[in-house]
Design a protein with these regions (language model features):
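C-terminal effector/interaction modules appended to NTPase cores
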Residues: 1-102
Length: 102
């Protein structure tokens, strides 16, 4: 899945003890990395929409891949991941669906 023409539909939880304010998932400016649980590779994403973040509660969100040179094929339905800002784990989630645009 090196082609970037897909959307990652996921359920995420942001940790209250890791951030002061909840991220805005709807303005197209929140671009953390996802790291598959048990792996080390950083997968850059751009959250494009989602429910309002309530710390420590699961919400739905959608993200786009951003790096053409990264293999995103590990992001399959059911894949669990951490949300990283720098070296800090600020949340976690799992993939609900991978929607191909083509």
């Amino acid at each position: 899945m090196s082609d970037l023409d897909f959307t990652i539909c996921c359920t995420v939880t942001f940790f209250s003890k890791k951030r002061r304010t909840p991220p805005n998932l709807n303005n197209g400016k929140y671009c953390p990395h996802l790291v598959i649980k048990g792996a080390k590779q950083l997968l850059g994403v751009n959250f494009i929409d989602g429910e309002d973040v309530i710390f420590d509660k699961q919400i739905r969100a959608n993200a786009l891949p951003v790096n053409e040179d990264i293999d995103y094929s590990v992001l399959q339905v059911g894949t669990e991941f951490f949300i990283m800002e720098g070296s800090a784990i600020v949340g976690e989630g799992f993939v609900k669906e991978v929607f191909q645009h083509q």
